[in-house]
């Protein structure tokens, strides 16, 4: 499970997820990527479920890159606790993902395998997604 080793502050503001992602909108490492079409918080459990779905489908072939990390804690008050008395205790970790961000990339497998693996991963995530290829986005080419 992805969690930060150390954080400066345990409790952080929720913030707003407005607009598009500033960077990470193209396929940089692999040949195919999974791009978010909505903005949403993605928990470390959802990231792990998507990673497992991709790696199980690809079996031993190919490589997976996870381009998001859950660095933001979210808090929750216990069940039956009255309002007030400060902010709740940290309950989990999330990665704030804005629209347009490429979350996962795969490489070293055929197009059919990559698209199906990313489709299975997309089912585990709370955002609408699109599968991109390096050629569609105009990413760097691997030809010398």
From Swiss-Prot:
Keywords recorded for this protein, A-Z: Ribonucleoprotein, Ribosomal protein, RNA-binding, rRNA-binding, tRNA-binding
Transmembrane segments: none
This protein's record includes keyword Ribonucleoprotein: yes
Signal peptide: none
InterPro entries: Ribosomal_uL16, Ribosomal_uL16_bact-type, Ribosomal_uL16_CS, Ribosomal_uL16_dom, Ribosomal_uL16_sf
Keyword field contains Chloroplast: no
GO BP, one annotated term: translation
A single MF term (Gene Ontology): tRNA binding
Pfam families per UniProt: Ribosomal_L16
A single Gene Ontology CC term: cytosolic large ribosomal subunit
Function: Binds 23S rRNA and is also seen to make contacts with the A and possibly P site tRNAs.
UniProt subunit comment: Part of the 50S ribosomal subunit.
Family to which this protein belongs: Belongs to the universal ribosomal protein uL16 family.
PANTHER family for this protein: 50S/60S RIBOSOMAL PROTEIN L16, LARGE RIBOSOMAL SUBUNIT PROTEIN UL16M
Protein name (database record): Large ribosomal subunit protein uL16
Organism: Levilactobacillus brevis (strain ATCC 367 / BCRC 12310 / CIP 105137 / JCM 1170 / LMG 11437 / NCIMB 947 / NCTC 947)
């Amino acid at each position: 499970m992805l969690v930060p080793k150390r954080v400066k502050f345990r409790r952080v503001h929720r913030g707003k997820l407005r607009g598009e992602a500033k960077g990470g909108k193209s396929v940089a490492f692999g040949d195919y990527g999974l791009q978010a079409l909505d903005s949403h918080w993605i928990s470390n459990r959802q990231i792990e479920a998507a990673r497992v779905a991709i790696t199980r489908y690809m079996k031993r072939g190919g490589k997976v890159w996870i381009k998001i990390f859950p660095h933001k804690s979210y808090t929750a008050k216990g069940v039956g606790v009255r309002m007030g008395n400060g902010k709740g205790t940290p309950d989990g970790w999330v990665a704030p993902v804005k629209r347009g961000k490429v979350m996962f990339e795969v490489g070293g497998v055929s197009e059919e395998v990559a698209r199906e693996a990313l489709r299975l991963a997309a089912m585990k995530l709370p955002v609408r997604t699109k599968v991109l290829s390096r050629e569609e986005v105009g990413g760097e080419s691997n030809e010398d």
